[in-house]
Amino acid sequence: MKRKIIVGSRRSKLALTQSNWVINKLKENYPEFDFEIKEIVTKGDRILDVTLSKVGGKGLFVSEVEQALSDEVIDFAVHSMKDVPSSLKEGLIIGAIPKRESPLDCFVFNRVNSLDELPQGSVIGTSSLRRAAQLLKHRPDFVIKPIRGNIDTRLQKLHAENFDAIILAKAGLARMGWLENTTLKLEDIPPELCLPAVGQGALAIECRESDQQIRDMLTSIHHEETGICVEAERVFLKKLNGGCEIPIAGFATRANEVVHFKGLVGNADGSIILASEQAGANPSEIGNKVAEDLLSEGADTIIKELRNI
């Protein structure tokens, strides 16, 4: 039996923080094992001067990590779930999904303290088409400007490049300890205004389907409710063949064994937003049903047009 486990991670501060969090959780259950992180640079890490939607393709932040997993260079990998394509590389599975952090997006303001205080024509930093489309539907006067880099870099750019606000995932801020920073002017964005990305706030721990030892180990940190909700979201994403070049969002919650799921697809400027909600016990059925609702409303036309731009 293996005593040293090699964990694959991107080398960003957030990715390493997440990987160390997973390792510490596993050490509580398996103190006899040693864990070592292997840092892997992905295509998404290398290309910083182009927005993700223009880079195109899927798995920009996971493909190289998945290859290392397939080649048995690493034993499992820790990803942000929202970066993981809806179809995994052959022979790989999601071995565990720990309890979800906040799925919300949040504003970080430069001068004001709330969305309502932002003046007409405010410049908002985000490279996410999903965030941009939903925000423009609410405030078409906003000017959306792309912003790339890790959390620290984007927070520096907020002031250095004179944005009125930038949008970040609250989970990343929480994991990096920024929510305790009282100098930041933060405001949560409710799902009614900006529905989160599929899997946002959740981690995906990926392993080889054939590696039963690792699979057994990972089940100890799997969170069933998060897994059920993320299943609905990812089935929805797969049905629509979504990627970062499409403004697509999906968020599920669960109460009393009933999954409530809302999904949406829009065009880039937010002038068209198609949305549907469903509830039921079976997460796959609910995710599929919402996707079918949107396809019947013309989502496939929007998706094809965006992919041809």
UniProtKB/Swiss-Prot annotation:
Residue list for modification S-(dipyrrolylmethanemethyl)cysteine: 244
One Pfam family named in its UniProt record: Porphobil_deam
Keywords: Porphyrin biosynthesis, Transferase
SUPFAM superfamilies according to UniProt: Periplasmic binding protein-like II, Porphobilinogen deaminase (hydroxymethylbilane synthase), C-terminal domain
Gene Ontology, cellular component aspect: cytoplasm
HAMAP family membership: Porphobil_deam (MF_00260)
Protein name: Porphobilinogen deaminase
Species, as recorded: Listeria monocytogenes serotype 4b (strain CLIP80459)
